[in-house]
């Protein structure tokens, strides 16, 4: 994934509001987060990160939990700069979703391979009207975004110790704030025994980590770049 400074973003730079955000939050408890998914042998993490933050915002606005289609983004958002199973960016997906409605997982199911776009406008459910971006590496800003708005799409530098993670608060000595190579979803944050952490939803199935999740050390100098390429869309019903 490219550096944030290399991206020509059409998003709105997020500015933390003055209103206080909670010291801890877990959006799973409010129904903003769907079940853990599995991207399989396809480099589509960016699509899962996109649908994850879309699902949270749709729940926030419509009070309805819907699992959205990653496969539609894999198959259809290439002209907006994405590369299917070869990688992509959440912000490119938002640009696509400004023009096309996002279908549900059930109407456009995941296949873990890039195929021909089979988008059906009649089945579109949600669209993007704009999106916030946070490229500063400022974890306080990300806390404000997640704490006040909901689950946010983020990117991190994944090294072998991340892949081998089983449980506990992950603290890496090897990952970089710059080498972003994997997109995930920040669904909350908290503190345990004096150690601040992010609650992060991955797309590697339930058998990885803490039933598909990882708690990543927070306020450790933007560890693994979690606050270097964050975003959150404004979502409305389609059309």
PLM regions and their residue ranges:
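Catalytic-core signature of thiol
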Residues: 1-239
């Amino acid at each position: 994934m490219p550096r944030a400074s290399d991206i020509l973003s059409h998003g709105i730079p997020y500015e933390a509001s003055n209103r206080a955000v909670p010291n801890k939050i877990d959006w799973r408890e409010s129904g903003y987060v769907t079940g853990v998914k599995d991207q399989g042998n396809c480099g589509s993490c960016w699509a899962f990160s996109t649908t994850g933050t879309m699902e949270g915002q749709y729940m926030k606005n419509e009070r309805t939990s819907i699992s959205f289609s990653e496969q539609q983004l894999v198959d259809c958002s290439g002209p907006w700069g994405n590369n299917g199973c070869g990688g992509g960016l959440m912000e490119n997906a938002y640009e696509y979703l400004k023009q096309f409605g996002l279908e549900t997982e059930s109407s456009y199911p995941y296949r873990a391979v890039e195929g021909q776009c089979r988008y059906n406008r009649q089945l579109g459910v949600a669209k993007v009207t704009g999106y916030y971006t946070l490229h500063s590496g400022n974890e306080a800003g990300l806390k404000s975004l997640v704490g006040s708005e909901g689950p946010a799409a983020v990117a991190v530098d994944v090294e072998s110790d991340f892949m081998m993670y089983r449980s506990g608060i992950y603290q890496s000595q090897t990952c970089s704030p710059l080498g972003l190579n994997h997109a995930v979803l920040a669904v909350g944050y908290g503190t345990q025994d004096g150690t601040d952490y992010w609650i992060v939803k991955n797309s590697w199935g339930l058998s990885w980590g803490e039933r598909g999740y990882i708690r990543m050390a927070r306020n450790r100098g933007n560890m693994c770049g979690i606050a270097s390429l964050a975003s959150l869309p404004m979502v409305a019903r389609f059309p």
